[in-house]
Amino acid sequence: MRTLRVKKPGGLDHLQLDDANAAEPGPGEIRVRWRASSLNYHDLLVANGGLSVADGRIPMSDGAGEVDALGAGVSRWAVGDQVMSLFFPNWQEGRHRPEHTRAVTGDSIDGCACEYAVISENAVTRMPKGLSFAEAATLPCAGLTAWQALMVRGQMQAGDSLLVQGSGGVSVVALQIAKAAGVSVIATTSSSEKGERLKELGADHVINYAEDQNWSDTVNKISGGGVDHVIDIGGGATLKDSINAARTSGHISLVGILGGVSAKIVVPMIFSKQLEIHGVAVGNAAMQDDMTRAFEASQIKPVIDRDFDLAETAEAFALQTSAQHFGKITLSI
């Protein structure tokens, strides 16, 4: 079977595609034939050496495929079932505890950049009906991050308002989830072309932050005093503006650090506006099942910019690094 590995010391030129034998599942395990994966910033850090992983680690946290074989005692799955990976396979339900996130797919344990994988029967959830493998593969990290931020932490409801930043995977799927829920969305981008695509997906207002350095003030004017929810992907570069753009008693979900890991913020504004600021890192299996049902009911179709073959993973990461993509980049396995 084709298997992609990250070889020491890391770097896109140290991604190695080799051939390995498919193992047989043991008790409580299943074998999955992965059909597709998708790229996340976390995967880039694993691939380029930004995160230290074991030599020969199989990368990629996102995967969609079908159950190929069952180990003894497995009853929740049947051969042929279509499934998605879990970013944190040990976090099944409830509030996060440290032990839930010690196993990270494609990081501390092997990921989905291989044709076959033997994993715990609890390491996958059901794929949404009506989606292709590539579309489903965009959801376990970016989709679930947006879902937890908006629907679990934010308790988003019809009539609310949302600010999304940029046009990457989390922001685009957050826009789609919000529009399906009857929410008004303001999106920011530095590209007029991407701005038009955001409008096509339902964004009610688009602000070009390259042309409007006071974009958070503009959000306040458009929304009449701030938005109910903010998806912040910029971290250090955008948190101050996110705080300014949120309404009183609003929710800010910190989901990325694309603009830096440190931020200077106006602390009094946080408590004077009584804001709730959440750090959101993907989610658990129960949340992923809820997201799946919502995607089936709303018939949301994830946005894929371009699909690459597994052998072209380095080229896929190069596109991701260029920031020229819109939505998700996927791999066919």
What kind of region is each of these model predictions?
Residues 22-37, 47-92, 108, 128-130:
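Glycine-rich beta-strand-centered segment in the early N-terminal region that forms part
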Residues 87-165:
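NAD(P)H dinucleotide-binding glycine-rich loop of Rossmann-like/cofactor-binding domains
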Residues 100-101, 181, 198-199, 233-306, ...:
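Glycine-rich phosphate-binding loop and adjacent beta-alpha segment
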Residues 161-164, 179-241:
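Adenosine-nucleotide cofactor-binding segment
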Residues 171-172:
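N-terminal Rossmann-fold NAD(P) dinucleotide-binding loop
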Residues 224, 299-303, 315-333:
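C-terminal capping/lid region of NAD(P)-dependent oxidoreductase domains
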